């Protein structure tokens, strides 16, 4: 708003300056015509001369002798006498009433250089649009004002946009930007749906709602399968666990018992040798061993049996309690060594799955 106000003030100053220049030019022309008339009057005092603003007969105002009426009053019809010379180039032809207000310069200065025009007159208030005044000046004075139309900024003003037009342009740009963003969003959604359709194993759905429902059902099925796999898979947990129980998963062939021992603890280099020593001390033989390590944690699943057959009740009471206490001691030893070496650098986390299966041949059992 400030910039617009400054531009309007500059245009008003330029307009006032141009009007003053026009008045000065017309004033010089007026006095030049008076001098020319006086010079010609000494040669022919009985005649009067008519000078036009553009050098044409009857197109301007009439200059009379000294005994005639003052030019500020009503003027008689012009004669056909032409001036002998005209040193200054006159402006282009203008309406006859244009010079009527020129002689009343004192009032014009007090009213802010107000000019009178045919069809316009002094009825126009000072609040009238400045552009209309510039347009009338340009049409009335022709080349005089047209040459100064650059400083007036008339053409520039006509090319300027109004505040409402600027707001409309901004709204149009915002609407186009919103439409472009919406188009890109829909394109991304369609690309994601196409990827989901390609991931599903067997899909015949084409509409978006059915496709999303099928994807949700497939994700639920994958989650259920993952839960089942996690229960049966040998993945070590974050907490230490120890379970010892009889099992029928493995058979010796001669009717001997089989015990399944599951051990989950921190991994260390001497864990496996300690377990082997413990089992040998209890006179147990390993039939199968499954070992899984993930990120410094290890899970051992052992299937063991006794070396010699004995009573079933004695075996159950002896094996379950003894194996559980022995493996618990191995776990505690692992925890103590882990706490003592906590200041050392941590072992690099890595995942591996190793399965060791030790199965004795049936011929060895039969020989016994």
UniProtKB/Swiss-Prot annotation:
SMART domains: HLH. One of its GO terms (molecular function) is DNA binding. Residues 333-368 are annotated as: Disordered. One of its GO terms (biological process) is regulation of DNA-templated transcription. Residues 337-368 have a biased composition (Polar residues). One of its GO terms (cellular component) is nucleus. The keyword Protease does not apply. The keyword Metal-binding does not apply. Residues 173-222 form the bHLH domain. It is found in: Nucleus. Residues 3-30 form a coiled coil. Keywords: Coiled coil, DNA-binding, Nucleus, Transcription, Transcription regulation. Homodimer. Interacts with LHW. PANTHER family: TRANSCRIPTION FACTOR BHLH30 (PTHR45844:SF2). This is Transcription factor bHLH30. The lineage of its organism: Eukaryota, Viridiplantae, Streptophyta, Embryophyta, Tracheophyta. The gene is BHLH30.
